[in-house]
Amino acid sequence: YLNQTEPLFDVLRVTERGFSGMVADHRNILKIVEDPSLAATNIAVQYDVTAEPQIVLTLQGPDDKALTDYLSEHRESLVQVLEKAERDRAVKFAEAFSEQRVAKAIKSTFGVDMTVPKGYVLAADEKDFLWARYEYPTASQGFFIYSYPYRGKESLSPGALLAARNEFAARIPGPSDGSYMTTSEAFEPDYRMFRMEGRLWCELRGFWDVHGDFMGGPFVSHALLDKKKGRVIVAE
């Protein structure tokens, strides 16, 4: 859900002869092996073969068509395996080098344990709203967390989630006086509800704008129902 096309991965293609040294130590590797003696196409998964952390997928098939057909049929599954490996690495790195000040603020404000990557700083911390940001020389990224009362199923509807998002996003100022973040009306956000680890979640994917200025981009938010405290917690 991006405002411009971007590849899922950066791909480096090498021959078997060139697969050595630093190339063989890449963290995500997909080997394609054509072997006419094979009766069917199969795939094997290995971890930490020449480096750590690393995932190596070896796809073997009797001919070009069999390999291509397998990739086409199982594309989504293969992408999910590689994406999970990337997420696991990111989580492991964040846990090793976390930003404790922001994590403690989240725990204090919302009672939630959250690992925050190093480099984030608190931009706002209120009783029902927290905003953390990471500044680059030419760009900025960040996340915000907020909560609002749960008053029944309607509190998790797309309309309620959007209304809450716009209310709290307005607390994030834009670059010019009087400007603030809001949800773009150019495209209706995608909404889905799902359960994970026994908890009910709602997801919104859409685009944000800055009211009163020219800025925008994609966003994804996840809302969690906290029945014990009668509230909805949203992280974006």
Predicted regions, residues:
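Secretory pathway targeting signatures of secreted, lumenal, and periplasmic proteins
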Residues: 1, 117-174, 209-211
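Signature of long, low-cysteine stretches enriched in small and polar/charged residues
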Residues: 14-66, 172-230
